[in-house]
């Protein structure tokens, strides 16, 4: 389990334009932080840089567990789960096939997958192909996949957007349990998360 993420002097550019620079952030076990800023400020790009999907113009992201530094590729492959604007679901699978496959692939088990399906009110949808689900149902499936995963660092890009009030409350409870168990959350948001989180301003 990761115990810290250390972002140092990070800068992100798009073409000739610097989105932000000299950003420092340390996130430790049991903490959540929200990235705030205007549209186009670089919040999603920051998440992608932490995930290793985008090369920063400057700076670094380092990871630590209880024994000290963890090689970045290992940390990302074994301890990180990112949920972006797109749900990243395979449309030809049934909801259960997708949830089960992704849960097992990230180190979880069928019991945790079934518990997550129940928590997000997906049981009646599990035999349906993902392509037949509504946008809100697909988001709930993606969140169930996240909840069933034992990975300690969650990177979330507008995770609450398509959810109704009841599902927002359910996901809020899942996030609270994740950080209470020593997990970490870094989220790009327009609206505040329903859990305690410090705010990090992103912008040039």
From Swiss-Prot:
MF (Gene Ontology): ABC-type heme transporter activity; ATP binding; ATP hydrolysis activity
Keywords: ATP-binding, Cell inner membrane, Cell membrane, Cytochrome c-type biogenesis, Membrane, Nucleotide-binding, Translocase, Transport
Primary residence: membrane
EC number in record: 7.6.2.5
InterPro entries: AAA+_ATPase, ABC_transporter-like_ATP-bd, ABC_transporter-like_CS, ABC_transptr_haem_export_CcmA, P-loop_NTPase
Keyword Cell inner membrane in record: yes
Topological relation to the membrane, as annotated: Peripheral membrane protein
Compartments (UniProt record): Cell inner membrane
GO biological process, one term: cytochrome complex assembly
Amino-acid positions noted as binding ATP in the UniProt annotation, renumbered to this chain: 37-44
Cited PROSITE patterns: ABC_TRANSPORTER_1, ABC_TRANSPORTER_2, CCMA
Annotated GO CC locations: plasma membrane
Domain ABC transporter: 5-202
Record's catalysed reaction(s): heme b(in) + ATP + H2O = heme b(out) + ADP + phosphate + H(+)
Function of the molecule: Part of the ABC transporter complex CcmAB involved in the biogenesis of c-type cytochromes; once thought to export heme, this seems not to be the case, but its exact role is uncertain. Responsible for energy coupling to the transport system.
Family indicated by similarity: Belongs to the ABC transporter superfamily. CcmA exporter (TC 3.A.1.107) family.
Oligomeric form and interacting partners: The complex is composed of two ATP-binding proteins (CcmA) and two transmembrane proteins (CcmB).
Matching NCBIfam families: ccmA
Protein name per UniProt: Cytochrome c biogenesis ATP-binding export protein CcmA
Gene: ccmA
């Amino acid at each position: 389990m990761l115990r810290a993420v250390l972002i140092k002097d990070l800068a992100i550019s798009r073409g000739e334009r610097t989105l932000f620079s000299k950003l420092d952030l340390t996130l430790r076990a049991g903490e959540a932080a929200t990235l705030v800023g205007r549209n186009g400020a670089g919040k999603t790009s920051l998440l992608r840089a932490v995930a290793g999907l985008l090369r920063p113009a400057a700076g670094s992201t380092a990871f630590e567990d209880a024994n000290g530094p963890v090689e970045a590729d290992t940390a990302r492959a074994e301890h990180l789960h990112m949920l972006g604007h797109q749900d990243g679901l395979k449309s030809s699978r049934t909801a259960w096939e997708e949830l089960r496959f992704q849960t097992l692939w990230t180190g979880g088990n069928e019991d945790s997958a079934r518990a997550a399906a129940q928590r997000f009110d997906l049981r009646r949808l599990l035999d349906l192909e993902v392509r037949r689900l509504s946008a809100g149902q697909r988001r709930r499936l993606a969140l169930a996949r996240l909840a069933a995963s034992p990975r300690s660092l969650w990177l979330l890009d507008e995770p609450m957007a398509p959810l109704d009030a009841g599902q927002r409350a359910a996901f809020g409870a899942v996030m609270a349990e994740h950080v209470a168990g020593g997990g970490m959350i870094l989220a790009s948001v327009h609206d505040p998360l329903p859990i305690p989180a410090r705010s990090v301003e992103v912008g040039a």
